[in-house]
Every structure is written in structure tokens, then in C-alpha cells.
């Protein structure tokens, strides 16, 4: 019994072999300008050789929205992975609060970069008896607005 392979099937397999490496080789990059599901805007400057980065964060939400100002962020990422994990801290200039984010940079099925994050927001309280309400937890998904020239 002789099996024959369709020329169309061979062409499809050859195409997949040529295209697949370029899909997996694409690396998700934190550097650039991002927006989240709430409308906040974050800019991450170039990541250095140790994986460290700085940037700015302009939140769209706050307890006192009239006082919102651009705030600095400082972070680090794993550099070897094509979809790296990372963490950063935002020091809010307009309140006695700090937020830490941790997440991963993904390339979705459409080839778009997305940052999936979880965060802890710690607000200052005047007495230890109010500690129970000083930390909030949540998540944000960020999508790229544009890249930042290095």
C-alpha cells in the first residue's frame, strides 16, 4: 500500500515551518506608553542590562481626583524570557500612598502586547487600629499606546 501526500498539505506544512519561528521569536517589551482599562497612562523608559527601569504613571482614578499629578515609578523585569514577568512601585506624588504592581508582558493571539497585572495600594492611616482598611488589591490590563524612542 502506497501513501501519497497532497501537494497542498506539503505547502501548508512548509509555510508553518517558515512562519512559526518568527512568531515565537517576538519578544514582549515593557518600554513605551501604555493605558489600562481605567484610562490611566503609564510610560516606561528603556530597560537597562540588569532589567531595571523607570517611568511615570498618571492615574485616572483617586480618592481626590482634583489632586492627581504625574508620579514616578521604579521597577525590574526578567530579561531572558520572551514574555517577561516584572514588578514596579509607584510613589504617588499627590497622596501618602504607594502602589506595587506585579505582572507579565504577553503577546496575544493577534500579535498585540498586553501587560496583565495585579496591584496592592497601601494608604497611610493615622492609627494601627485602622490598618485593616489601609491596603487595597486589584488588577489592571494595559495595552500599548506607542513605543518610546530609546
Curated annotation (Swiss-Prot):
Glycans are attached at residues 67, 93, 141. Pfam families: Avidin (PF01382). Biotin binds at residues 36, 40, 57, 59, 63, 95, 140. The keyword Cell cycle does not apply. The keyword Signal applies. Residues 1-24 form the signal peptide. Keywords: Biotin, Disulfide bond, Glycoprotein, Secreted, Signal. GO terms for cellular component: extracellular region. Belongs to the avidin/streptavidin family. This is Avidin-related protein 4/5. It comes from Gallus gallus (Chicken).
Amino acid at each position: 500500500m502506497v501513501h501519497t501526500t497532497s501537494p497542498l498539505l506539503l505547502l501548508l506544512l512548509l509555510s508553518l515551518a517558515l512562519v512559526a519561528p518568527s512568531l515565537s521569536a517576538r519578544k514582549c517589551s515593557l518600554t513605551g506608553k501604555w493605558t489600562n482599562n481605567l484610562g490611566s497612562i503609564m510610560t516606561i523608559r528603556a530597560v537597562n542590562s540588569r532589567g531595571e527601569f523607570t517611568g511615570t504613571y498618571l492615574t485616572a482614578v483617586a480618592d481626590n481626583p482634583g489632586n492627581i499629578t504625574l508620579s514616578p515609578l521604579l521597577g525590574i523585569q526578567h530579561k531572558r524570557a520572551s514574555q517577561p514577568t516584572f514588578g514596579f512601585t509607584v510613589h504617588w506624588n499627590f497622596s501618602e500612598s504607594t502602589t506595587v504592581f506585579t505582572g507579565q508582558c504577553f503577546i496575544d493571539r493577534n500579535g498585540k502586547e498586553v501587560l496583565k497585572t495585579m496591584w496592592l495600594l497601601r494608604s497611610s492611616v493615622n492609627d494601627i487600629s485602622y490598618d485593616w482598611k489601609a491596603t487595597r488589591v486589584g488588577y489592571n490590563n494595559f495595552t500599548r499606546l506607542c513605543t518610546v524612542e530609546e
